[in-house]
Design a protein with these regions (language model features):
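Short, low-complexity N-terminal intrinsically disordered segments enriched in polar/charged residues
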Residues: 1-26
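Residue-level detection of beta-strand scaffold positions
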Residues: 11-12, 23-27, 47-48, 58, ...
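Alpha-helix boundary/capping and short turn/kink residues
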Residues: 18-21, 37, 85
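Flexible, active-site-adjacent loop/turn segments at secondary-structure boundaries
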Residues: 26, 39, 82
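A short gly/proline-enriched turn/hairpin at secondary-structure junctions
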Residues: 31-42
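A beta-strand edge to alpha-helix "cap/lid" segment located at domain peripheries
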Residues: 35, 48-109
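Short beta-edge strand/loop motif at the mouth of beta-sheet-based domains
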Residues: 41-49
Length: 109
């Protein structure tokens, strides 16, 4: 996955590709948040659990489509292909950064 992105997002994408929930959670601030499928996950432990559950439930591959940066916010468009209804699907991953970490991630269609 090649993408010119700030370091915390590049690290997140590498951890995502490796399916490493621990590494994903370390990309976030201590009180970082993820909003996905109508639910919020706050803190690294909750983010780790969310990532593990998503990887087990959906078994997907993420392919980057494009990215746009606006200040401390980066929107990454990704195509997810896998074992879930409606596959493939394109989703926006909206990252907000703080102190070289991800403060929040919102995933939406």
């Amino acid at each position: 996955m090649t993408l010119d992105a700030p370091e915390p997002i590049a690290a997140y994408l590498a951890a995502e590709e490796a399916k490493d929930a621990d590494a994903v959670s370390r990309c976030f601030t201590e009180d970082g948040t993820v909003h996905d499928e109508g639910r919020d996950y706050r803190g690294r432990d909750a983010i780790r659990q969310w990532k593990q559950a998503a990887d087990e439930k959906y078994r997907y591959v993420l392919q980057m489509v494009n990215a746009q940066t606006h200040g401390n916010e980066v929107t990454v468009r990704a195509r997810l292909t896998g074992e879930f209804p409606g596959s493939p699907v394109e989703l926006d991953h909206i990252f907000k950064l703080s102190n070289n970490k991800i403060a929040s991630l919102e995933i939406r269609s």
